[in-house]
């Protein structure tokens, strides 16, 4: 719809809105591909599975959003500021921005609710920082980006209507482009931490230790290391101490019991490696 309104009105703000909508569509497509590929079974070449595929495809979409969508919006806005051009059919422009703001605001609200529900927290920022659901985090950022873009577009439209200065159409597109670039950087920072090997939260580590110590035969836990292997799924390496007098069979039973207890208590564990530290 936005591309049609952009053609009708000759507004670069609406063109930026259309580009932002295209970025949403592209990102959704890449997320779908990444999510699908991340569910592939482990094989001889990828023995820990394909969970990290979703990070790669999300990164591709974010790079396209930063270098294409944001750049074009900034360029179009800058050119309109230098060479102002008339805007026609302004009611269509306002209607397009209003619809974009309403739909993106609603989608943003739903994304935030889902994020907080998954993390069992009402604190939006903490939920965002702690969540390992990269697809939900990406959707939340995209919806917020769309909401802010429409808001900035409306502000630019109002100022243009009050002043009659066509340059504000360019300023609006410029700000939208900067907004898209900033949101892209936020996603890049989040993706970097997961690609580099981000560990689970301190609360999850605490739960792992509690479950281990509650397992019969485990005397202590000397080390816990974790790393996300995809959306919410992570691998766990835990070092435990047991009684020196135990036989190999008894130690094996303890390790098997510990793995079962951990998998039952924490559903997101994909692989567990238990090592003895005596």
What is the predicted function of each stretch?
Residues 8-13, 163-167:
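Transmembrane helix interruption/hinge and helix-loop junction motifs
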Residues 1-11, 73-77, 155:
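Membrane-embedded alpha-helical segments in integral membrane proteins
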Residues 3, 9, 21-32, 99-112:
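Hydrophobic alpha-helical membrane-embedded segments
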């Amino acid at each position: 719809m936005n591309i049609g309104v952009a053609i009708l009105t000759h507004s670069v703000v609406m063109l930026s809105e259309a580009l932002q909508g295209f970025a949403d569509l592209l990102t959704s497509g890449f997320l779908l591909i990444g999510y699908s590929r991340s569910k592939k079974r482990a094989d001889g070449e990828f023995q820990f599975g394909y969970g990290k595929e979703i990070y790669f495809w999300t990164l591709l979409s974010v790079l396209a959003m930063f270098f294409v969508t944001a750049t074009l919006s900034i360029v179009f806005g800058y050119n309109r500021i230098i060479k102002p051009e008339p805007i026609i059919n302004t009611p269509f422009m306002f209607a397009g921005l209003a619809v974009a703001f309403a739909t993106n605001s609603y989608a943003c609200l739903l994304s935030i609710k889902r994020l907080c529900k998954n993390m069992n927290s009402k604190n939006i920022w903490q939920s965002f920082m702690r969540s390992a659901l990269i697809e939900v985090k990406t959707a939340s950022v995209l919806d917020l980006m769309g909401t802010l873009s429409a808001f900035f577009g409306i502000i630019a439209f109002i100022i243009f209507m009050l002043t009659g200065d066509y340059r504000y159409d360019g300023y609006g597109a410029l700000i939208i482009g900067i907004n898209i670039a900033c949101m892209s950087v936020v996603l890049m920072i989040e993706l970097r931490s997961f690609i580099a090997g981000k560990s689970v939260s301190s609360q999850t580590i605490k739960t792992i230790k509690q479950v281990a110590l509650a397992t019969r035969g485990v005397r202590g836990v000397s080390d816990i290391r974790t790393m996300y292997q995809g959306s919410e799924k992570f691998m766990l390496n835990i070092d435990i101490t047991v009684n020196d007098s135990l036989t190999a069979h008894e130690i094996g039973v303890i390790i098997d019991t510990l793995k079962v207890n951990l998998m039952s208590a924490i559903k997101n564990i994909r692989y567990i490696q238990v090592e003895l530290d005596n």
